[in-house]
């Protein structure tokens, strides 16, 4: 293995240990009760090493959610399923990127506060945002390839519209809490409105 490959593997291993240690501590005691010193101790590294990877404890929370969303994002490639309407496909994509976080509601609240407070997105979040855009663009291309669809707007505008609606849905979901009935209804309605703009 080359020195660069070994160095990268060690970097990824250290990052994974930090995220894993933080996740375990957050689950046991809550995000606010855990310190960076405790995360470093649980990961068997120095506190400074944690800061080499993450600017703040909240950025570890963002990393955890990005990993959850990577899995949900992969499932969007399966959409639309056979017999699924455009509105159903968009709603399914929207809800997959929300429902995967039911067990992580406190994390989502931290994520939203970090997202809105930051002057610019963390590099990891910016990179993941590009992946989300690509997955959604591919979904819109598949939907627009169906008979009876119109291309009144460019795909990047459709992706931006979806993402704008979706961030509002995530905020509503995080504020509402279980059983998320209002958020679920709003997802269906917002995505139905977006779908109407695509159909002839």
Give the location of each predicted region.
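Basic, helix-initiating cap at the start of DNA-binding domains
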Residues: 1-29, 33-45, 58-62
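C-terminal peripheral helix-coil segments that are non-catalytic and often amphipathic
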Residues: 1-2, 99, 134-146, 164-171, ...
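Base-recognition residues in the alpha-helical recognition helix of bacterial helix-turn-helix
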Residues: 27, 51-55, 63, 67
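Key DNA-contact positions within bacterial/archaeal DNA-binding proteins
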Residues: 48
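Hydrophobic alpha-helical connector segments
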Residues: 63, 77-106, 150, 155-162, ...
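Amphipathic alpha-helical packing segments from all-alpha helical-bundle domains
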Residues: 70-73, 77, 103, 120-146, ...
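Helix-loop "lid/cap" segments that line or gate small-molecule binding pockets
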Residues: 76-78, 95-102, 110-117, 192-195
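Amphipathic alpha-helical segments used for helix-helix packing
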Residues: 100-122, 138, 171-175
């Amino acid at each position: 293995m080359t020195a660069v490959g070994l160095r990268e593997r060690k970097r990824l291993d250290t990052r994974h240990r930090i995220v894993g240690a933080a996740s375990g501590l957050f689950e046991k005691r809550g995000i606010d009760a855990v310190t960076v010193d405790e995360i470093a101790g649980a990961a068997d590294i120095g506190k400074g090493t944690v800061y080499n990877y993450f600017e703040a404890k909240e950025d570890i929370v963002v990393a955890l959610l990005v990993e959850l969303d990577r899995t949900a994002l992969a499932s969007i490639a399966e959409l639309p399923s056979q017999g699924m309407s455009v509105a159903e496909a968009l709603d399914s994509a929207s809800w997959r990127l929300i429902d995967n976080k039911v067990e992580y509601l406190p994390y989502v609240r931290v994520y939203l506060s970090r997202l809105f407070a930051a002057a610019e997105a963390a590099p990891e979040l910016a990179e993941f945002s590009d992946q989300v855009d690509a997955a959604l663009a591919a979904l819109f291309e598949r939907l627009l390839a169906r008979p009876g669809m119109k291309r009144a707007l460019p795909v990047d505008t459709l992706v931006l519209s979806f993402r704008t609606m979706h961030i509002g849905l995530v905020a509503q979901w995080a504020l509402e809490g279980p059983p998320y009935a209002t958020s679920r209804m709003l997802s269906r309605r917002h995505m139905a409105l977006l779908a109407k703009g695509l159909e002839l």
